[in-house]
Curated annotation (Swiss-Prot):
Its membrane topology: Multi-pass membrane protein
Superkingdom assignment: Eukaryota
Entry function: Golgi membrane protein involved in vesicular trafficking.
The protein, known as: Golgi apparatus membrane protein TVP18
Subcellular location: Golgi apparatus membrane
Keyword line: Glycoprotein, Golgi apparatus, Membrane, Transmembrane, Transmembrane helix
UniProt lineage: Eukaryota, Fungi, Dikarya, Ascomycota, Pezizomycotina
Similarity comment text for this entry: Belongs to the TVP18 family.
Membrane-spanning intervals of the chain: 12-32, 44-64, 89-109, 112-132
Length: 153
């Protein structure tokens, strides 16, 4: 199934997975840039939220690209924690918590982390809609969904 065909299925979990990838990129890039700029102004709160955003980006990477759990040497407890986030509702909840944490960074100072918070919120909403509509979670084959791991191993 091509990427175009995946989007034509109108399954919100596919939309959520791709928005998750965009969220991961934004969390890492904006977290890094805000951390570097806040180091010079010594804004400890923004540095802390920037570090959290970068940690979230790595969590999202392992959640959205399941093939990495097979390739990367990780602990069994980390693998078990990531595998718990497998249903649409669990993913919606996880993204909701991550979005809330990043939105809280706006309390002290408004930074570009708002863009990451918006995308995390949209991702959580897509997974929530997929769960509410009763759509089964479908992993994108482009991102290492069903069948890709078996082809590599």
């Amino acid at each position: 199934m091509t990427l175009k065909e995946e989007f034509q299925t109108r399954n919100f979990s596919i939309y959520g997975q791709w928005l998750g990838i965009l969220s991961m990129i934004l969390c890492f890039a904006l977290g890094l840039s805000n951390m570097i700029s806040s180091i010079f102004s010594l804004n400890i709160v923004i540095i802390a939220f920037s570090i959290l955003a970068m940690v979230f980006s790595f969590v999202i990477l392992f959640v959205e690209v399941p093939l990495l759990l097979r390739i990367c040497p990780t602990s069994s407890s980390f693998d078990a924690a990531i595998r718990k986030i497998s249903t649409n509702y669990m993913r919606a909840g996880a993204y909701g918590v991550m979005a809330l944490v990043i939105w809280l960074s706006c309390i002290s100072t408004r930074t570009s982390l708002i863009a990451a918070a918006v995308f995390l919120t949209l991702t959580g909403a897509c997974y929530g809609l997929a769960g509410a509509k009763g759509q089964a979670f479908v992993g994108s084959k482009t991102l290492g969904g069903q069948g890709v791991a078996q082809m590599i191993v």
